[in-house]
Structures are given as C-alpha cells and as structure tokens.
Amino acid sequence: MEKVKIEEIQSTAKKQRIATHTHIKGLGLEPTGIPIKLAAGFVGQLEAREAAGLVVDMIKQKKMAGKALLLAGPPGTGKTALALGISQELGSKVPFCPMVGSEVYSSEVKKTEVLMENFRRAIGLRIKETKEVYEGEVTELSPEETESLTGGYGKSISHVVITLKTVKGTKHLKLDPTIYDALIKEKVAVGDVIYIEANSGAVKRVGRSDAFATEFDLEAEEYVPLPKGEVHKKKEIVQDVTLQDLDAANARPQGGQDILSLMGQMMKPRKTEITDKLRQEINKVVNRYIDEGVAELVPGVLFIDEVHMLDMECFSYLNRALESSLSPIVIFATNRGVCNVRGTDMPSPHGVPIDLLDRLVIIRTQIYDPSEMIQIIAIRAQVEELTVDEECLVLLGEIGQRTSLRHAVQLLSPASIVAKMNGRDNICKADIEEVTSLYLDAKSSAKLLHEQQEKYIS
C-alpha cells in the first residue's frame, strides 16, 4: 500500500527574540494572593512576590497613585523580573514605562525634563466617545456626475449614492463627494463591509462579506460576517492615550504648505523641551474631560532601574513630583548597599537620600539557593528550546553559586552549539565543562588581573 504523505505546516508568524526575561508571564500568585513556589516563570522570592501582588491590587483599585516602591537586593536576584511581573499582572491597558537611571543625562534636554516626560508617559487617559456610524455591506455604489463648473468637457462628482445592507435591513445613502475620495482610497467595491463615521466622514473598510468567501481570488481577503442590527447606529469608542502623547501632539503642530515649513519637516528635528505652560493647559483640558465624565485617568507604573545613578537634583525633583495630583506609581530598583549619593560625599542606604527613602516602601529580594538556581536554568533552557540533562543542570547550578546566575544562564547557548558540533541534540556535562574553560566569569577575570597586575597598564 502506498504511504500517505502528511506534512506539517510551519507557522509564518515572526518569532520573537528571546530576551533575558521572556519566561516571566506574571507574579505566579493564587487568587488569594499567596505565591506559588514555581509559577509564571518565577522561582522562589515568595515574600517579594506576595508584597508585589498587594501592590498590583492597590494599583487596580487606584489606591496607590503617587506612592513609590523600592526593590532592593543583590545583583541577579530578580528585581527587574519582579517589576516585569507586576506589569504583566496589570495587563496592557495600564501604562508601564521602564527606564534606567542613566537615561536622564542628555546634552539637549534637562534631567528633570526627561523625568517629567517619563512620568507623563506612565499616566494614561481613557477617552470614551460616542460616534454615529453607518455600517453594512455595500450592495450598490454609484457616483452621480454633473457638468464641471469651470467649463470644458470635464465632469465633477456631485454626490455618491451608496446602499448598505445589514441583517436587519437596507439603507440608501446620498454622500458628499469628499467621501467618494475616501471610498476610492480604501478601495471599496460592491460586496465589501464598511463603516462610515457620520461626523468626520471617515471611511473604514472592515473586510469582504463572507457571502463571497467561495470566490477564487489571488489576493488573500479577510472575510467578515454581515453586520448585525441597523445600518445607522451609535458606537462607543474607547481610546487609550498617555499624557505624554497629548504633550507631544500639541508641542509639534503640523506646519503649513510653504517651502520653509516643508524644509523644516524634512530636516531632523532637534529634541526640544515641552514647556510647563503647555503641560498646565493640557492638565486643565484633561481635568475638564474627567469632570464631564468623558475621560478617565489611569495611573500607570514608572519603573526606574539603577536608581542610584540619579543625582541630588533628580531626587529633589522626585520628592515634589511624587506629591503632585497627576502622579503614577513609581517603582525604583537598585543593587547598591550603603554608598554615596551621586555627586555628593554623603553616604546613604542604596545610594538614595534619606528624605526620599522615607516616602518609599521597600521590598527585599533574596539570593537564590542551589535548587532554585537549577529550576531557573531549567526554565531558561525550556524557553530557548534546548535539551539539558539532569547532571548538566546540577553542574550549572554549582557554577551559578560559585559565579552568578547570569553567567550560568549565558553558558546555555554556546554549550548548545558545542553539542551540535559534536553531533548531539542534548547538552551534556562535557559541553558545559568545555564552554566554562573558554569563557571566564567576572570573579575569575578579576583574580587573573590581580595575579598578572604588572603586565597590564594601570
């Protein structure tokens, strides 16, 4: 009997690059808020995750706006992962703006301006708008022409007659000639499902009606069902924007059509500051929208990693910004112990001034034990689609304890290439030993430098 050929279809979707925290999918908590030992890509750090879970609940209930949080712990203990877990738990509707302390230093823009931009990027505004729309399948589309007013043989379109059909009924519409241009731009034809906004005259082609799904067409069409309800309906449209989007839109109005404006648009614009006056005007409009019930403020999260990189000016600015009416939840992270505040001789815990530390609640992250390190390395191997045996994981756990977790995880990719060169799919102990002899960790390199100090230029 002839063998039936069955082929698997490979997905054409783009594969995302595997980053350091790709495996983090949330905080891994039960509905009661109790952390699960191994869940959502997280291993251990039970107290820190439980504390972060309470923060997420407070953010969702809008009880934590203007408050700040500090994630403190040694390097490689999951501070950034914890912040990312918080953002995953909050979902895509709550703005999450990550930045690094060193980002504030720019030759063009003041430090405080960079901080303010990120503050406003972390505050969302949900605008609800009721729009009148005509929606349905196009059954007739005929432009009506008249003699051109300028004379000659040319003709101009006076109006467009269009018939839209839904499940409930049909409507004949007489549209303005400007809408005809929008119909041509969207390539609307009979059998397409479209919707037209009554106020602006904007036309959106949703797709082809599924009644035509049996047609053979070279171009891949998106087939959509016939719209339900009446042709003329009111739709509530919700838009999510950030305050920084509003600032940027109003700070750079579109230029005219003259040659100077066009040249100015083509040239690379220099990054300029948005004035306080403009921000205050936008705040007034936002407050009016909130009072009218048109918009709703969504305080998001601003995550500042390596907070010890900020100086006294930034910290004094943060003190004031945290107490303003429009302030997001700010999460700081640092791996410093007692050190000088940048630009001063004043020692302070975590490199943060005492007056700002008073305003923070601090979450500690603990160093991972060997069994937790082995579990993390196993999760990373799974994410990177690598096969690692048990003996190899134990060795990587020992390397992680001796050097750092990051170094142990970084050895996985080169070890997989060594395994493939040796004709194996799975990584074994010999591959890890070979890679370890090739690549030094920070402690080994420092020890070597100390031993061969006289051979280096100091």
UniProtKB/Swiss-Prot annotation:
GO terms for cellular component: nucleolus; nucleus; Swr1 complex. Interacts with FRI, and with FLX and FES1, two component of the transcription activator complex FRI-C. Interacts with the disease resistance genes RPM1 and RPP5. Its main location: nucleus. Keywords: ATP-binding, Developmental protein, Differentiation, Flowering, Helicase, Hydrolase, Nucleotide-binding, Nucleus. Belongs to the RuvB family. Its EC number is 3.6.4.12. It holds the Pfam family TIP49. It is an enzyme of class 3 (hydrolase). It catalyses: ATP + H2O = ADP + phosphate + H(+). GO terms for molecular function: ATP binding; ATP hydrolysis activity; ATP-dependent activity, acting on DNA; helicase activity. The keyword Hydrolase applies. It is found in: Nucleus. One of its GO terms (biological process) is cell differentiation. It comes from the Eukaryota. Disruption phenotype: Gametophyte lethality. ATP binds at residues 73-80. Proposed core component of the chromatin remodeling INO80 complex which is involved in transcriptional regulation, DNA replication and probably DNA repair. Component of the NuA4 histone acetyltransferase complex which is involved in transcriptional activation of select genes principally by acetylation of nucleosomal histones H4 and H2A. Has single-stranded DNA-stimulated ATPase and ATP-dependent DNA helicase (3' to 5') activity suggesting a role in nuclear processes such as recombination and transcription. The gene is RIN1. Gene3D superfamilies: 1.10.8.60, P-loop containing nucleotide triphosphate hydrolases, RuvB-like helicase, domain II. This is RuvB-like protein 1. SUPFAM superfamilies: P-loop containing nucleoside triphosphate hydrolases (SSF52540). InterPro entries: AAA+_ATPase (IPR003593), P-loop_NTPase (IPR027417), RuvB-like (IPR027238), RuvB-like_C (IPR041048), RuvBL1/2_DNA/RNA_bd_dom (IPR042487), TIP49_P-loop (IPR010339). It comes from Arabidopsis thaliana.
